[in-house]
Swiss-Prot record:
EC top class, as a word: hydrolase
Name listed for the protein in its UniProt record: Peptidyl-tRNA hydrolase
One GO process term, biological-process aspect: rescue of stalled ribosome
Subunit-level organization: Monomer.
SUPFAM superfamilies xrefs: Peptidyl-tRNA hydrolase-like
PROSITE patterns associated with the record: PEPT_TRNA_HYDROL_1, PEPT_TRNA_HYDROL_2
Gene3D superfamilies tied to this protein: Peptidyl-tRNA hydrolase
Family: Belongs to the PTH family.
Site feature: Discriminates between blocked and unblocked aminoacyl-tRNA: 12
Organism: Shewanella sp. (strain ANA-3)
């Protein structure tokens, strides 16, 4: 694999969405920025909050789009084009309905699984699905008609603790990714489950 040069955390903008399950990807990028000692600042050129960080001597751009979720590709495309970053050098963190809270996994490629943020990113990357994802489990409401309200709702305290623990472990695994490689990062993260 090429090195990861752009890490994106998917979210909806604004205080009313900040603590909703759909913003789990942003929580991960915020924590990554914190441990790297950098601040995410608004940049209208890239339609989001951005920072330049260094992880184990390697440069990486951090991005949280401030478009709405279904327009995330606008931000990702703008930054990737400007810095000539290819899809396989991008890691997109997002909430994942098909995994329980307390679990997170890396993945290369695949479809969008109905996730509007991923759907728009794939479209804006000329239908190239070959980017990395960090899937952060939020669980499923059990009824597909309840999904929208579920992802835009806040998790109960115990579930939130589990999601936060998985996000923290994902950040530590990202350090392994930059220090070692994706295989070691996957091995570490995929054996983790918060209880």
């Amino acid at each position: 694999m090429g090195e990861i040069k752009l890490i994106v955390g998917l979210a909806n903008p604004g205080a009313e969405y900040a603590q909703t399950r759909h913003n789990a990807g942003a929580w991960y990028v915020e924590e990554l920025a914190r441990i790297c000692g950098v601040s995410l600042v608004p940049d209208s050129k890239y339609f989001g909050l951005t920072a330049r960080a260094v992880l184990h001597g390697k440069d990486v751009r951090l991005l949280i789009p401030t478009t709405y979720m279904n327009l995330s590709g606008k931000a990702v495309g703008a930054l990737a084009n400007f810095f000539r970053i290819t899809p396989e050098e991008i890691l997109v963190a997002h909430d994942e309905l098909d995994m329980p809270p307390g679990v997170a996994k890396f993945k290369l490629g695949g479809g969008h699984g109905g996730h509007n943020g991923l759907k728009d990113i794939i479209a804006k990357l000329a239908n190239d699905k070959n980017f990395y994802r960090l899937r952060i489990g939020i669980g499923h409401p059990g009824d597909k008609n309840k999904v929208s309200g579920y992802v835009l709702g806040k998790a109960p305290a115990k579930e939130q603790e589990l999601i936060n623990a998985a996000v923290d472990e994902a950040v530590r695994s990202t350090e392994v990714l930059f220090k070692e490689d994706m295989v070691k990062a996957m091995t570490r993260l995929h054996s983790f489950k918060a209880e």
